[in-house]
Amino acid sequence: MAQTLINDTFLRALLREPTDYTPIWLMRQAGRYLPEYNATRARAGSFLGLAKHPDYATEVTLQPLERFPLDAAILFSDILTIPDAMGLGLDFAAGEGPKFAHPVRTEADVAKLAVPDIGATLGYVTDAVREIRRALTDGEGRQRVPLIGFSGSPWTLACYMVEGGGSDDFRTVKSMAYARPDLMHRILDVNAQAVAAYLNAQIEAGAQAVMIFDTWGGALADGAYQRFSLDYIRRVVAQLKREHDGARVPAIAFTKGGGLWLEDLAATGVDAVGLDWTVNLGRARERVAGRVALQGNLDPTILFAPPEAIRAEARAVLDSYGNHPGHVFNLGHGISQFTPPEHVAELVDEVHRHSRAIRSGTGS
């Protein structure tokens, strides 16, 4: 049975086509701020238990859509699935975040790196994509909203692979980049090939848009960012499938702290650039001059404010962009685990309400 999208507003906005309102989804929209997520995680036993079992991943992917009229679903997974598939031994210690048992530090470590067999090592992800697509679709073949697939960027993956986990200053990975750029470029080359293959596998399984999360690109200096992050994002984008089943598959790139390099990101070949909250959205729209759509960019901590303040800040973001195509509303980074769910409901409602008013010319 042929599938049709009931709500394709998100995809049309990414392609800079006119929409009746501004679509919204939220980074980490399926997460610890939702009681139902925590209940499912408890059943799964761990974060990796959630991410590596398609039934659980499907369940938590759909949870925010049951609460809020969001305009897209995003695959529940983790950005570190690729290095885990490379054999680095990913674990999430309680209260400590991700850790790798086998960090990549030496020439011998780098020499052992290889692009994983996506089907053999990451089949649980593509299985989840297929299962989520089925769950989003009713008996008549009508799909509620599009599904987003994603990966970490080559540089961001390298940060975790070399540091062995998170870091405050990234001194180990940066030291390698400056002292042994040959090793760093070898890691990044393998990562770029793996990210492209991984995203293409998600597209073939049913992801209708894909996003590259360059969470730590902003830790680099100007110049180093272009060499070690941007160039490899460009390589990934060049290898992506941009059509599947007769439909365009838009690509989004997001560098946290990357406002300085907006024009560079817009020139990578992506359809949209994600922005954090430090960037003026109206000026960003002028800077990209219609070449790409923009996604963002409310400060996530605003969701701790009273409802009327949340609504006012949402209106400010929408007013900054103005009545132009090509905007997807999002946070400037992932939603905090401490966010009250009822505040998310206020945000989603105001984005839909006020953007419709802007389109109609009333704007209030």
Curated annotation (Swiss-Prot):
- Biological pathway: Porphyrin-containing compound metabolism; protoporphyrin-IX biosynthesis; coproporphyrinogen-III from 5-aminolevulinate: step 4/4
Q: Which residues bind substrate?
A: 28-32, 78, 160, 215, 333
> Which InterPro entries does the UniProt entry name for this protein?
UROD/MetE-like_sf, Uroporphyrinogen_deCO2ase_HemE, Uroporphyrinogen_deCOase
Q: What is its EC number?
A: 4.1.1.37
* Single GO molecular function: uroporphyrinogen decarboxylase activity
| Alphabetical UniProt keywords | Cytoplasm, Decarboxylase, Lyase, Porphyrin biosynthesis
Q: Looking at the keywords, is Magnesium present?
A: no
Domain of life (superkingdom): Bacteria
Gene Ontology terms: cellular component: cytosol
Picking any one GO biological process from the record gives: protoporphyrinogen IX biosynthetic process from glutamate
Q: Does the keyword Signal apply?
A: no
Could you tell me what reaction this enzyme catalyses?
uroporphyrinogen III + 4 H(+) = coproporphyrinogen III + 4 CO2
Xref: PANTHER family? METHYLTETRAHYDROFOLATE:HOMOCYSTEINE METHYLTRANSFERASE RELATED, UROPORPHYRINOGEN DECARBOXYLASE
What is this protein's record name?
Uroporphyrinogen decarboxylase
Write the lineage as a comma-separated list. Answer: Bacteria, Pseudomonadati, Pseudomonadota, Betaproteobacteria, Burkholderiales
Query: Gene encoding this polypeptide?
Result: hemE
